[in-house]
Amino acid sequence: MPSQVIPEKQKAIVFYETDGKLEYKDVTVPEPKPNEILVHVKYSGVCHSDLHAWHGDWPFQLKFPLIGGHEGAGVVVKLGSNVKGWKVGDFAGIKWLNGTCMSCEYCEVGNESQCPYLDGTGFTHDGTFQEYATADAVQAAHIPPNVNLAEVAPILCAGITVYKALKRANVIPGQWVTISGACGGLGSLAIQYALAMGYRVIGIDGGNAKRKLFEQLGGEIFIDFTEEKDIVGAIIKATNGGSHGVINVSVSEAAIEASTRYCRPNGTVVLVGMPAHAYCNSDVFNQVVKSISIVGSCVGNRADTREALDFFARGLIKSPIHLAGLSDVPEIFAKMEKGEIVGRYVVETSK
């Protein structure tokens, strides 16, 4: 496929300091390094991590000025001089994990998210809230052809992340998984991956809109935290002993603590959501006697990415998205802060 004309300037959302003004402005289109591809980003998901990057309330080093976003889906328009395995015209995904060294002890065994030289999209590397963005060719995701780019965008972070978390829960088909924070961007995908993997799903969230989405996605038991006064007791009763696995994607410290009490003996609590400055409090006696495992799960590796995208490409996962324009990012952040989003926002970079 012949190379398309690449403009010198493009639209982007830029901020110059933590909590600084989110400016929708013209910036220069980046030039890919020898190891990078340049992607014409058609769509980008908006993740809660983007909000944390803007606030600067996670202990990550940030570059400034910074273009956020890390769920970019688009088309390859240019290759760096050393790039192999890609061609102009390929569908490509830009993940949070933009690049790693591929030679440290963590990269060698597929734990790239622990690489000490990790380059994070939307944190240390300008992200996908722009029309053209670069990504390391090794870590960029190969998106299958004929996939809807708007709908696949959230898979590139939210989908991969919850898929990896479900694998870490060590649950077998027919057992119970509880999704805490079930109907946000991550939770709505976690429900579907869990069902596709053969698990029975309980969802915890608040409000009728989220109950409706949970039921539409095929979940079995919904617990509304605004109505249920004894969430721990309700889950233990419904599952006849507790949930075999728990995926915590909520940003509530209290919800994390509760999950350690309704987890079944020998079960696994997986921490995914990262509320700023929060702690995981677990009663030691309860944890020891019940032999509960509490594990953290960050983003997935390249194999997890391929597997998560395969579920999507086969039609097993649907993205409950709301489309907006790139210029709407400030308003989306405001809704996110208020907990008003059901599903996932995806922005079209040309608007």
Curated annotation (Swiss-Prot):
Principal localisation: cytoplasm
Modification sites for Phosphoserine: S282, S319
GO molecular function, one term: alcohol dehydrogenase (NAD+) activity
Chain residues that bind NAD(+): H48, S49, H52, G184, G185, L186, D205, K210, F225, V272, M274, S297, V299, R344
Highest taxon, organism lineage: Eukaryota
InterPro entries reported for this sequence: ADH-like_C, ADH-like_N, ADH_Zn_CS, GroES-like_sf, NAD(P)-bd_dom_sf, PKS_ER
UniProt-annotated binding residues for Zn(2+) 2: C101, C104, C107, C115
First-level EC class: oxidoreductase
Gene Ontology annotations for the cellular component aspect, listed alphabetically: cytoplasm; nucleus
Cross-link named Glycyl lysine isopeptide (Lys-Gly) (interchain with G-Cter in ubiquitin), sites: K229, K237, K290
Residues binding Zn(2+) 1, per UniProt: C47, H70, E71, C157
Cofactor note: Binds 2 Zn(2+) ions per subunit.
E.C. number: 1.1.1.1
Catalyzed chemical reaction(s): a primary alcohol + NAD(+) = an aldehyde + NADH + H(+); a secondary alcohol + NAD(+) = a ketone + NADH + H(+)
Keywords, in A-Z order: Cytoplasm, Isopeptide bond, Metal-binding, NAD, Oxidoreductase, Phosphoprotein, Ubl conjugation, Zinc
Cofactor: Zn(2+)
One Gene Ontology biological process: glycolytic fermentation to ethanol
Modification Phosphothreonine occurs at: T226
Subcellular location(s) of the protein: Cytoplasm
Function of the protein: Can reduces acetaldehyde to ethanol. The role of ADH5 in yeast metabolism is not yet known, but ADH5 is not responsible for the production of ethanol during growth on glucose nor responsible for the oxidation of ethanol to acetaldehyde.
General remark: Present with 1310 molecules/cell in log phase SD medium.
Family to which this protein belongs: Belongs to the zinc-containing alcohol dehydrogenase family.
Descriptive protein name: Alcohol dehydrogenase 5
Annotated organism of origin: Saccharomyces cerevisiae (strain ATCC 204508 / S288c)
Biological classification of the source: Eukaryota, Fungi, Dikarya, Ascomycota, Saccharomycotina
Chain's gene name: ADH5
